[in-house]
């Protein structure tokens, strides 16, 4: 579970920096679809929505992991399956779409329960619950939109950050070549890809065989894995880096470094803007660490307990 611990630490540190600012999150802290989902989930219990600060009244005292009474869930292509749930004051948590929130591993359920339990005494900040946002999106949005998500991910390929370089010989090009070499080596060894690298401003079209192999790899992902890759690819501007990181080939800190490589080089040259670049860094840390942590918890098994311990709450949904 080393990968999960590293991702959790990175996400927690970034969230503390964002929460310390107060008020609403900066633009891009979470995909709009996920942020709306988290608000809808908490707001349904109160019959309202988040206020202008992006917060909700806290309407529960205890969040805990429970054995889900509806069992393993329905069969279906890519449908998340699990036997664990999260209860708020013994009321089962449901998605914004009123679907049961089933977790494939106890570890993931415990992490989501912790996100709820560690909210403030008076208010809930949905933007500080990246795992909850990802899980809700996977359950409500992904099953009916898998084809569109895969197509959207493939749109990254021709201009993938791992494949588009600055002019040869420049410091940026050297940093890109050194940084992305392990990602491309992994893509060759694990996926059988031979992607083209280019310094053209508009990227370069990739071969049909490369596109076909990547499409097949994406279609094999379950809904939770797919939503993790989707958010991570957006944060990194790289499908290849997102796949490598969610497969454990690139650590969370290295993934974050590569995701911000160009921006950090610009900061080195021109200086950092307080209240701008520092917030961008925290935003990127959450968007990178959250998906990696999600996949690590999926693959790391069911170790770990829920916040407040495992309970017997199996009542109505929130």
Task: Show which residues each predicted segment covers.
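N-terminal mitochondrial targeting presequence
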Residues: 1-51, 318
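Intrinsically disordered, low-complexity regions enriched in glycine and serine
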Residues: 3-10, 72-77, 302-315
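An N-terminal structural lobe/cap that precedes and organizes the functional/catalytic core
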Residues: 43-144
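Short cationic amphipathic helices and targeting signals
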Residues: 99-103, 161-164, 171, 241
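Internal, conserved structured core segments that host functional sites
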Residues: 147-214
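An internal, amphipathic alpha-helical element
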Residues: 206-275, 286
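Long hydrophobic alpha-helical segments typical of transmembrane helices together
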Residues: 256-304, 308-318
């Amino acid at each position: 579970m080393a990968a999960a611990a590293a991702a959790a630490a990175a996400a927690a540190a970034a969230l503390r920096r964002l929460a310390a600012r107060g008020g609403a999150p900066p633009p891009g802290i979470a995909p709009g679809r996920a942020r709306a989902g988290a608000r809808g989930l908490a707001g349904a219990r109160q019959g309202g929505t988040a206020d202008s600060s992006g917060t909700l009244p806290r309407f529960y005292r205890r969040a805990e992991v429970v054995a889900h009474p509806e069992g393993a869930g329905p069969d279906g292509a890519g449908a998340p399956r699990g036997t664990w749930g999260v209860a708020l004051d013994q009321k089962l948590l449901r998605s914004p779409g009123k679907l049961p929130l089933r977790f494939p591993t106890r570890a993931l359920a415990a992490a989501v329960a912790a996100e709820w339990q560690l909210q403030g005494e008076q208010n809930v900040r949905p933007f500080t619950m990246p795992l909850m946002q990802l899980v809700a999106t996977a359950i409500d949005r992904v099953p009916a939109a898998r084809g569109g998500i895969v197509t959207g991910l493939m749109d990254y390929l021709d201009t993938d950050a791992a494949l588009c370089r600055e002019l040869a010989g420049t410091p940026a090009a050297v940093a890109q070549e050194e940084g992305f070499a392990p990602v491309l080596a992994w893509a060759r060894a694990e996926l059988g890809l031979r992607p083209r690298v280019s310094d053209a401003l508009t990227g370069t079209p990739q071969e049909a065989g490369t596109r076909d192999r990547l499409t097949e790899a994406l279609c094999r992902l379950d809904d939770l894995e797919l939503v993790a890759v989707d958010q991570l690819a957006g944060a990194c501007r790289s499908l290849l880096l997102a796949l490598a990181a969610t497969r454990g080939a690139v650590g969370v800190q290295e993934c974050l470094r590569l995701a911000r490589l160009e921006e950090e080089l610009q900061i080195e040259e021109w200086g950092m803007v307080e209240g701008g670049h520092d917030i961008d860094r925290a935003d990127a840390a959450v968007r990178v660490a959250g998906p990696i942590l999600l996949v690590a918890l999926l693959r790391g098994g069911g170790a770990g307990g829920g916040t407040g311990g495992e309970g017997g709450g199996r009542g109505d949904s929130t």
